[in-house]
Amino acid sequence: MAAVTQFLSQPSSIRGTLNQYQLNQTSLSRIPFLSLKSTLKPLKRLSVKAAVSQNSTKTLTKESASSFDHCFKKSSDGFLYCEGTKVQDIMETVEKRPFYLYSKPQITRNLEAYKEALEGVRSVIGYAIKANNNLKILEHLRSLGCGAVLVSGNELRLALLAGFDPTKCIFNGNGKSLEDLVLAAQEGVFVNVDSEFDLNNIVEASRISGKQVNVLLRINPDVDPQVHPYVATGNKNSKFGIRNEKLQWFLDEVKAHPKELKLVGAHCHLGSTITKVDIFRDAAVLMIEYIDEIRRQGFEVSYLNIGGGLGIDYYHAGAVLPTPMDLINTVRELVLSRDLNLIIEPGRSLIANTCCFVNHVTGVKTNGTKNFIVIDGSMAELIRPSLYDAYQHIELVSPTPPEAEVTKFDVVGPVCESADFLGKDRELPTPPQGAGLVVHDAGAYCMSMASTYNLKMRPPEYWVEEDGSITKIRHAETFDDHLRFFEGL
């Protein structure tokens, strides 16, 4: 893109350039058939561990989790419904290939739960675009007042295309390029400083763009979020953030560059799939200590940015998990006591439970010791089980004949890898060929991590509207799309 390659020579706003890339809104067809150096003493290195937190939150109740009830439900007749619309009917109308199906009303309900929790607190709900980067979903979240958390230059460009207010956007990352930082400076987004070289690049970007950059310092709090190591981002071994014993160096550097940098806050990020909200309070207590010290050195910081996402009930086992209200209540008084603006970065908890990945059964087989349901979807479209050994609930969309044997299956795809599975040892009725099968809670880190391995093309996406009608919100990729990368070579 010309807008990308010419940043350094063209410091003017990129918005006008991006307009030529606006998607044709009419191309997303509507289907009418169904109604993110000082003299002061060095700061003491502090460490907190969630496992020994003394600030336990109130007991969670099933009522507190009501905002996150599942939008996909089985009826007494054995059919799966999304917002009252039968999934089997949708399968019979759309393209005969795997697809992602969302509930637009559930996206709204999830965001409203955060907005309700944040009442009385100056805040920004920064949706983590990495969780799901569908443009139509971004536009919907923006229309509901969401900000955006970005971890790449292209996510920043997409946020601008979706109409997000740049002053409600936060640019994270441990390897931000100079070109992307120039764009961030031009547009006025917040930038979280991750390292010494990152700060130097932000200073250079400010000089190129001619604009002062609002920055927050990403401090690694060394908090144990008790999650999968691949999604833990706030412990001492993480590649992200500033070591707290180095904080004074960064404060001195910001003071040395008053034209380029304005320090407005502090940031930490804990990880993903967090189910113990005391971790957030432990981190907030530590971050407040840092903010108090930063203010004592003359900085007028007004933002506390706590990143890290709530977990969800992937097992569909009735687990009572913390809600946005539970989360915010752990830090509310701390934030208010320091007159801070709170920035949070939900991704998974906003979008995961709004979607399922819909597949067709190609056939059933056995190797003598293990049974397999082979489907047309695969690790190419949904890699979480293969990559993280993650569990996502699987079920059939319609009832099977009474005589269908119920047994344990591995649910696998057609990709030429033994790691190509969506679920292992799942007890299911033996499905007939062509039956519909869904992988639940597929709204986050599924489509955004999809690939074209084995030339499996990325699938289409649809959502169920408030009135029950179905809208295509992303076209399927095709073989012709793949060939375009080689045109003129």
UniProtKB/Swiss-Prot annotation:
Active-site residues, record numbering mapped to chain: 416 (proton donor)
GO MF terms held by the record: diaminopimelate decarboxylase activity
Cellular component GO terms held in the UniProt record: chloroplast; chloroplast stroma; plasma membrane
Keywords: Acetylation, Amino-acid biosynthesis, Chloroplast, Decarboxylase, Lyase, Lysine biosynthesis, Plastid, Pyridoxal phosphate, Transit peptide
Keyword Plastid: yes
Catalytic activity of the protein: meso-2,6-diaminopimelate + H(+) = L-lysine + CO2
Record SUPFAM superfamilies: Alanine racemase C-terminal domain-like (SSF50621), PLP-binding barrel (SSF51419)
Family annotation (Pfam families): Orn_Arg_deC_N, Orn_DAP_Arg_deC
Binding, substrate: 348, 384, 388, 417, 445
Complex formation: Homodimer.
HAMAP family, per database record: LysA
Record protein name field: Diaminopimelate decarboxylase 2, chloroplastic
